[in-house]
């Protein structure tokens, strides 16, 4: 699998949201991904009952750790009308075949297609999680907080994951003009 990047430009994020708005399901998936730090496998496993209170408690599939977090306004604005006629036991991102969520591959295609249409490359489902980490870091400059939110084992891993390390290296190369 190719390396994917966070989406650092908020205008590009907005452009992707506008593109995805034609499908409330796809827009909600992208919005939750950007605002929760969840991996795509955890996003796809969410049910209506897990989110309708506005607070999520779930066990992450990869780490088996319990994750708790409130759903912010960006998520709730898309979520509330989307789940209005859905039952608690329904998957949020149900496939058209019914009874199951869409596949990780389908989610990948949705995000990849939207990002391409908006002029971005090297963006995929994992970019949503990376974008969350990047934006938390940009807002707080607290890499320990980012590390905790992403369940990483070290600050260095988090910096590399969100693309900060490479950005700093690139800037040094650009600034040194001998």
Language-model regions, residue ranges each:
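Conserved catalytic core of the tyrosine transesterase superfamily
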Residues: 1-178
């Amino acid at each position: 699998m190719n390396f994917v990047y966070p989406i650092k430009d908020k205008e590009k994020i907005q452009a992707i949201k506008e593109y995805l708005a034609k499908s409330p399901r796809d827009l909600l998936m992208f919005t939750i991904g950007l605002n929760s730090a969840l991996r795509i496998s955890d996003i796809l496993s969410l049910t209506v009952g897990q989110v309708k209170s506005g607070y999520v408690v779930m066990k992450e599939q990869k780490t088996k750790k319990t994750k708790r977090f409130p759903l912010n306004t960006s998520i709730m604005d898309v979520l509330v009308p989307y789940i209005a006629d859905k039952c608690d036991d329904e998957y949020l991102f149900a496939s058209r075949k019914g009874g199951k969520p869409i596949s990780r591959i389908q989610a990948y295609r949705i995000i990849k297609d939207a990002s391409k249409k908006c002029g971005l490359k090297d963006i995929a489902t994992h970019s949503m999680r990376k974008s969350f980490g990047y934006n938390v870091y940009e807002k707080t400059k607290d890499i320990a907080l980012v590390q905790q939110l992403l369940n990483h084992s070290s600050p260095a891993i988090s910096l590399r994951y969100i693309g900060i390390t490479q950005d700093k290296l690139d800037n040094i190369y650009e600034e040194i003009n001998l």
